[in-house]
């Protein structure tokens, strides 16, 4: 649905026209020909400005039929907005784009070529909503660069945050100062998501993987820059037009800080990075001398001697000499276990349990399984990513498939000599995560929880791990399982050479802190459920990565997770690479609240060898995201 509103001579008129557009529910409004500017809201907003000598469109034409456009101005490199400009560019409009993102706009093919291997063991954690093919840009702009249309001038403002090199544009028409803010803001105190802000925090020596809100500081600086301009109107790339900029930006600043303050209060990184580095992070976002809290360390002690410690692996040793390996991230673990066999500490490795798919826990699991001739166990919901890592795009993805994985259901029990083993779904640090509860008559229960918690809190620092926020999944579900253990238990995170546990009071504090974060996320983002803001893969293409011979017909599935509290009807439209053909497809699908389902397509892939992107648009009530998801395809010669 598009709502068109002409700009005349006053802010009051614009506000009235916005209200009228809402009341008309999509009926087109008449546009007087003498107006300088026309705004059409939609999945991507479209702004047409006509000067005395030239015309320009900001963001793109969206679904409008626009003619005689000289320039199209891009706010950033991301294809989920840039698609709206493609028709105008094809018609001959010249492109203006941020110089800071030149490589991703001009030659994205280089990114995708490197990404075929770079997507494994990826610790940078940047969005891959990147163009498939480069654009010819006529003018690269940085801070202060102008475009004079004749009677109307547009000035570039560097406003990083949503992307590293985002640009906003400032103009003044009839005495009204207007800023076209890109994705800096998406509504009254709201942004589109949080995962887009994941990045390294160099001043604290924190890489992208651990950089929760890593570009929040840049965003806050950009907000302040726009506030200093004292604008009358903000026009974002997506979301509602803002006629009270100061109020909207103040709310956004407050909400970002509230979310980050909540994150710090329960962060596992306090154990690893200590107060000094966490303080640097806090100062960048919250300000100098701002108040924030870090969770004090919980109780911990040395690991008992019947659990062997090696890197991010553990070996559960029975009094019989039999053993069970927990994770295997490198060949040194295999060599260490062989020494235990050689010296008689153990007489057999009976199996391997994998807590989650991350490379530092899985890279040598297949080799260990072959070396010790033993089965590999995992909980059902992440078995496929262990077997077929190339079908996924996730942080820290291992590259070596684990061929034979025994799938266990949540709650399955296995007797292992004097130990009782209970397999658990434990979607903590990542969605694809499990845990193993080990009980014995003589010992307090030991819960192998992968990387989900440390003595200072929860490992939710990488949003792209899919840290969900529903009551019955994610960290709240993990906390409920720990609570069930009572007071006498121990937790093992294999990055920590100790066992540790939380008191009842600490568990309540963690749960309360996370619930506060859920509400902060809800207030900050535009979706009807905050999980969309932290789960980039609520929609994804499966398989994500594919290597095939030319002319292959292959099945692809768009996997949809409905985080909303209502049933959703989805429509999926594929964007095929050149030379591909859609053979069959499920056009629409109904997904109950909280459920997961998919749209299946059979696609004949190109015959010409090369790298390609298959992409898709997703539509539902209140959701219209285009060029949103991708699958990378490498076509090899059929010979």
Predicted regions: what is each one?
Residues 29-65, 168-182, 186-187, 291-342, ...:
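Conserved beta-strand hairpin/beta-sheet module of binuclear metal-dependent hydrolase folds
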Residues 36, 61-146, 332-334, 340-415:
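Active-site HxH/HxHxD metal-binding segment of metal-dependent hydrolases
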Residues 55, 146-149, 153-246, 251, ...:
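Metallo-beta-lactamase
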Residues 518-549:
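Low-complexity, acidic Ser/Thr/Pro/Gly-rich terminal tails and inter-domain linkers that flank the onset
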Residues 559-564:
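Asparagine-centered strand-capping/turn motif at beta-strand->loop junctions
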Residues 565-579, 618-619:
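Short acidic, flexible loop segments centered on an aromatic residue
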Residues 588-597, 635-636:
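Short proline/glycine- and polar residue-rich coil/turn motifs
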Residues 604-610:
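Short, surface-exposed loop/turn segments at beta-strand-coil junctions that are enriched for proline
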